[in-house]
Amino acid sequence: DFAGRSLSKYPIISMYKPFRNDLINWFVGRSRSKKTDNASVFPRDNFPFKNVLQALKKPNVFFYVGDEDLGYENSEFADFFFQQQSTLVAIRKIVEITNCSVVPVLNLFDSKSSKYITYIDKPLSDFPSDSITCDARLINSSFEKLINIEKTEYMWSLRFFQTRPRNVDYPYKKL
């Protein structure tokens, strides 16, 4: 959310996965899209994806958070810090359709300055390739590169390794 907020002064389009609680959705939606922003932020379930694709054919920026584990569907397993991670491949499909650039962005807390800093890397080159697995690995390695700037401040609370390759143990304690 902090990276999206820091980029919201620019004309960007973004989507988010709604929470189960309507009140939380209201607060989060309000904080993600203030009246002074140029950002347009939509809940995934109420915004047709074709609108994103049409918007990307114009000079627009689509802020897409790809470091989520949404299960087996639309994912490919690739290494992420030496663990097989279910990596979203939707960004690959978006690039194939729109020919847009993919620019890795990550927001990290800088313990020295006590501020959040948005790191923007150079666009991925040769993306997409002929291999979904290679593309998933490229996406993950771009995240690794940015996370390595300040590893301890990355949002490790996300359950990245929730979806496991078949016959691989679940890494978290079952509560």
Where are these regions (language model features)?
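Catalytic core of membrane glycerolipid acyltransferases/transacylases, capturing the structured
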Residues: 1-45, 69-79, 83
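Non-catalytic C-terminal accessory region of glycerolipid acyltransferases
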Residues: 9, 46-175
